[in-house]
From Swiss-Prot:
It is found in: Nucleus. It holds the Pfam family Oberon_cc. Keywords: Coiled coil, Developmental protein, Host-virus interaction, Metal-binding, Nucleus, Zinc, Zinc-finger. Required for the maintenance and/or establishment of both the shoot and root meristems, probably by controlling the expression of the meristem genes and of genes required for auxin responses. Involved in the development of the basal pole and in auxin-mediated root and vascular development in the embryo. Confers sensitivity to turnip mosaic virus (TuMV) probably by promoting viral movement and multiplication via interaction with TuMV VPg. GO terms for biological process: maintenance of root meristem identity; maintenance of shoot apical meristem identity; regulation of gene expression; root meristem specification; transport of virus in host, cell to cell. Residues 28-38, 45-56, 521-538 have a biased composition (Polar residues). Residues 1-56, 519-549 are annotated as: Disordered. A zinc finger (PHD-type) spans 224-288. One of its GO terms (cellular component) is nucleus. Self-interacts and probably forms heteromers. Binds to VPg of pea seed borne mosaic virus (PSbMV), turnip mosaic virus (TuMV) and lettuce mosaic virus (LMV), but not with VPg of tobacco etch virus (TEV), cowpea mosaic virus (CPMV), tomato black ring virus (TBRV) and grapevine fan leaf virus (GFLV). Its main location: nucleus. This is OBERON-like protein. GO terms for molecular function: zinc ion binding.
């Protein structure tokens, strides 16, 4: 079979789609979840171990839900009331009644609803480590333990509410991506395991009405895009990463088939002759498919479109498939893949490698098979013919020995190259160590210089501090001197001012005295002519007052 589904890869979603198995997404059957708890490792939806601890704030609620589920009445175990707070959390969406949450979401702005989706995307990315993983597992357990999430109740959900519930159940954050717009019916089908959760597939389940045991019993499994061993899907097409069963058309990851022992050497009958070939045993139907022809078909149809990196990756897949092959053609293909990988790593153009591998497949097709001489049975073989057959056997043994020798030489060459690479790496590391030592010495010298500069600056600071103290004391002394001189000058000024005022007062006194005397003399002359006058009495009082001054 050719690689699965030659469909274009959906643009813009590769980073937001994770590989998740149905078990990791939370199967309604607790036994199913426990049986494959170690299979999902690519997203926070991986199953928790028995040592996981749940958040204590909701531990009692979780135990109650589990107990009611065991007793068979989980349909009525949904919490009926939401807290009176205006805030709503992802736990409320996962736990509370559908109609109540839907009604509240219709009254919330779109920006607030986007916050829920962003918060869940952050949890699904798992960047918060164990805390985010535990939070997601707790949300998933809440959703999976509910019995009221049916077609009838999910049809009334708010769009954002339904997207969050589907993302929690599947563990795929693509359902929260702004560019992904699935219908409400499709989201409900995905939630109820009626439709493939792979957005690029979207087939109704069971796909193609398959009635095999895996499709019938494994919830959410799609045989068109999922591996029958790990139950995961991806967007790899035109690749040897997937192996398809020729009989039941189910697909398996090459890595899963190798690790699960589904690839080995077995008998194959072609043209009436029995020979050993590398076979793939399907995990779904337990029947075998031949791998060499499948690899040839993949390379013939898809190799011309591969770049060098993809070509090396595909050759590595083929190399690991035929690594333990015991048939001659499988061993030749294994050696050829190793040879081409080495050449591509050394810079050989990928179109040339494509031509080489395709011509190699043609050589394998025209390689004559061993013929069986059925018509010679029962008769004696001539000596010359016996010698020829012995020679053929010897030639075949020599060819095998040469092939083994070539393989050993290649291994020795690879070991020598690895040794040379190690020696070169040691030399590089030695140079790096020398450089680091020199750098360390230089840094040490710089540190010493900086320390000496710091000490010098500290000494300068101490000196400046000392000078500042002396200057401060000198300023205080000068201030005291200036203050004393100011006080003395003020006293001198006051003394001179008082003396000046006193001399002025004396002069004025003398002037008034002279004036009074003059007036007295004039009045005396007048009084001799006339009697006492009231003004004479006033002058006498003024004279007494001046004398007192």
């Amino acid at each position: 079979m050719l690689p699965p589904r030659q469909q274009p890869r959906p643009g813009g979603l590769q980073t937001s789609l994770s590989l998740v198995s149905p078990d990791a997404c939370g199967s309604p059957n607790p036994q199913e979840r426990g049986s494959t708890s170690d299979q999902a490792r690519d997203s926070p939806s991986e199953s928790a171990s028995s040592r996981e601890t749940w958040p204590t704030s909701d531990a009692l609620m979780l135990k109650k839900l589990e107990k009611e589920k065991e007793n068979g009445y989980t349909e009525h175990s949904v919490v009926r009331n939401i807290s009176n707070s205006d805030k709503m959390s992802l736990r409320d969406i996962a736990r509370e009644r559908v109609d109540v949450i839907a009604e509240r979401m219709r009254n919330l702005p779109d920006e607030y609803l986007e916050k829920f989706k962003h918060e869940l995307r952050v949890i699904l990315e798992g960047l918060g480590g164990a805390q985010h993983r535990e939070e997601f597992l707790f949300l998933q357990r809440l959703v999976n333990s509910r019995g009221d999430l049916t077609d009838g109740t999910l049809i009334i959900t708010h769009r954002t509410q339904l997207e969050i519930l589907v993302a929690i159940k599947t563990g795929i954050q693509a359902f929260l991506h702004p560019s992904v717009s699935l219908s409400q019916a499709s989201l409900i089908d995905i939630f109820l395991y009626k439709r493939c959760r792979n957005i690029a597939c979207g087939s109704m389940l069971p796909a193609e009405e398959c009635s095999c045991e895996i499709c019938a019993k494994k919830n959410g499994f799609c045989n068109l895009c999922m591996c029958v061993i790990c139950y995961k899907f991806d967007f790899e097409v035109n690749s040897c990463r997937w192996i398809g069963c020729d009989l039941c058309s189910h697909w398996t990851h090459t890595d899963c088939a190798i690790s699960n022992g589904q690839i080995g050497t077995g008998p194959s009958v072609k043209n009436g002759a029995s020979s050993a070939e590398t076979l793939f045993r399907c995990h779904a139907c337990s029947r075998t498919s031949e791998l060499l022809g499948w690899v040839k078909d993949v390379f013939q149809h898809c190799a011309p479109s591969w770049d060098a990196e993809a070509f090396v990756r595909e050759l590595d897949y083929v190399r690991r498939i035929f690594q333990r092959s015991e048939d001659a053609r499988g061993r030749k293909l294994f050696w050829k893949c190793e040879e081409l990988i080495e050449k591509l790593k050394n810079g050989v153009a990928d179109p040339m490698a494509c031509k080489v591998i395709l011509s190699f497949f043609q050589e394998l097709d025209v390689d004559p098979s061993k013929s069986q001489d059925n018509d010679e049975g029962g008769r004696l073989i001539a000596p010359e013919e016996a010698f020829n057959k012995i020679a053929d056997v010897v030639q075949e043994a020599i060819r095998k020995m040469e092939a083994v020798a070539e393989e050993k030489m290649r291994m020795v060459k690879k070991a020598r190259l690895a040794l040379d690479a190690c020696d070169q790496e040691l030399k590089d590391k030695a140079r790096e160590v020398t450089s680091l030592k020199m750098e360390r010495q230089r840094k040490k010298q710089q540190i010493d210089e900086l320390e000496s500069i710091v000490r010098l600056k500290q000494a300068e600071a101490d000196m400046f501090d000392l000078k500042a103290g002396e200057a401060r004391r000198e300023a205080e002394r000068l201030q005291r001197i200036a203050l004393a001189k100011t006080e003395k000058s003020e006293e001198d000024y006051a003394s001179r001012y008082l003396k000046q005022r006193l001399s002025e007062a004396e002069a004025e006194k003398q002037y008034l005295f002279e004036k009074i005397k003059l007036q007295e003399s004039s009045r005396a002359s007048q009084s001799s002519a006339g009697g006492n006058d009231p003004s004479q009495m006033m002058y006498s009082k003024i004279q007494d007052l001046i004398k007192n001054m």
